[in-house]
Amino acid sequence: MHLTPREREKLLIVTAADLARRRQARGLKLNYPEAVAIITYEIIEGARDGRSVAELMSYGTTILQREQVMAGVAEMIPEVQVEATFPDGTKLVTVHHPIR
């Protein structure tokens, strides 16, 4: 299978988000990379589903709550920026304070 660097990056995000969701399902609190992976994955998939940048910026703040992450993780993530592919091209989605 031949993948471009961008496709490999997306595959890595999907794998990391899947692992994070499994740990979350076991009742574990998420660490920094796990939280970022889940938020990033949800934004990428939302763009693929045809949601707008504005919708995803708002949705990005509802994906995870403070209770779901380890102490201090929410403060470590002041924003998440995701370059996502929309039906009309690639756009940058910035989610400010994604974990509330």
Swiss-Prot record:
GO MF, any single term: nickel cation binding
Pathway: Nitrogen metabolism; urea degradation; CO(2) and NH(3) from urea (urease route): step 1/1
Main location group: cytoplasm
Regions that span the bilayer: none
Superkingdom, taxonomy of origin: Bacteria
EC annotation from Swiss-Prot or TrEMBL: 3.5.1.5
GO BP term, pick one: urea catabolic process
GO cellular component, as recorded: cytoplasm
Catalytic activity, as annotated: urea + 2 H2O + H(+) = hydrogencarbonate + 2 NH4(+)
InterPro entries: Urease_gamma, Urease_gamma/gamma-beta_su, Urease_gamma_sf, Urease_subunit
Keywords: Cytoplasm, Hydrolase
Cellular location(s): Cytoplasm
Assigned protein family: Belongs to the urease gamma subunit family.
Subunit (UniProt): Heterotrimer of UreA (gamma), UreB (beta) and UreC (alpha) subunits. Three heterotrimers associate to form the active enzyme.
The protein's name in its UniProt record: Urease subunit gamma
Source organism per UniProt: Opitutus terrae (strain DSM 11246 / JCM 15787 / PB90-1)
Species lineage: Bacteria, Pseudomonadati, Verrucomicrobiota, Opitutia, Opitutales
